[in-house]
């Protein structure tokens, strides 16, 4: 049975923190888990804790063992969900396609799932069923994003402002601040064909980290030398006061687009009154964000059929795998019948040509009926009637002579 144990989505942060998975203890975790489970993958990120497994234990017994291995307090069991079979692997396909991410359709989770799968491979914790499941889910996630073209709809403030600036044909930029948001802004900017970015920072040593000739790292004291030569400012500092003021900007000149991603604001209110400026603050950007989230959600639902196709294929593969022993037995029976019939004929005929012909005819006849029986079992298994038909076919073909 393929199953999944995970932390519920609405679990408060202070409770989520109690479900710690320590990366340094993976060797110990996998060692203990594989004593109880046939296969296991640990997916642990800052927003997600999920254990995928292949086992035959009952749910209560399984939960207790998992809690013991990870040293979790069983008192918090109510914050955990457990599901199995199709619901479990549907969840993984949805995770890889971005349906369960805080930012719908984001790419990061796909890399995290891939890392978790490769980690399990290193510890020899996956074999056939989870191996196939994770390969299919990762492939599905890649194809889903590509065909749904989610990249066309940015849903984070940093990606939105870059997208909006590029639409306005800006090519010369100034980015103020190089914290988490600033780094994302730079990443998105440098993925486009822009001309120049003046990166304004307090620590000029940051220039050693950036290997791109389009980037000029400058200090806040130097920013006013270049501020009137650019077309767009993106400000994302943590300063408690404005860092872009009216006196910094010349009243004459071409249009200047300014995006202020900071709270409190980086850009002085009066800057918006200048005739050449267009100023957008975090509230304006958030409205674009809300619209984009709805657009992205609609687009993802429109393309859910891509995920459902992979889900169906895996489900069918799993069902057919469950009857592999029956197929193997049928082929063995067919081969036994063929060999016995050929042996009987060989004793009755001395003509080598006749014996060779008999070999071919008996083999082809045996293969025809066995293969047809296998086709019927596969068809009926996928319809959900496999057990009944396996019983009938075994009665026909596997009766002792």
From Swiss-Prot:
SUPFAM superfamilies: Glutamyl tRNA-reductase catalytic, N-terminal domain, NAD(P)-binding Rossmann-fold domains. NADP(+) binds at residues 177-182. Pathway: Porphyrin-containing compound metabolism; protoporphyrin-IX biosynthesis; 5-aminolevulinate from L-glutamyl-tRNA(Glu): step 1/2. GO terms for molecular function: glutamyl-tRNA reductase activity; NADP binding. Its EC number is 1.2.1.70. The active site is at residue 46. PROSITE patterns: GLUTR (PS00747). Keywords: NADP, Oxidoreductase, Porphyrin biosynthesis. It is an enzyme of class 1 (oxidoreductase). Substrate binds at residues 45-48, 101, 106-108, 112. It catalyses: (S)-4-amino-5-oxopentanoate + tRNA(Glu) + NADP(+) = L-glutamyl-tRNA(Glu) + NADPH + H(+). Catalyzes the NADPH-dependent reduction of glutamyl-tRNA(Glu) to glutamate 1-semialdehyde (GSA). Homodimer. During catalysis, the active site Cys acts as a nucleophile attacking the alpha-carbonyl group of tRNA-bound glutamate with the formation of a thioester intermediate between enzyme and glutamate, and the concomitant release of tRNA(Glu). The thioester intermediate is finally reduced by direct hydride transfer from NADPH, to form the product GSA. HAMAP family: Glu_tRNA_reductase. Belongs to the glutamyl-tRNA reductase family. This is Glutamyl-tRNA reductase. The lineage of its organism: Bacteria, Bacillati, Bacillota, Clostridia, Eubacteriales.
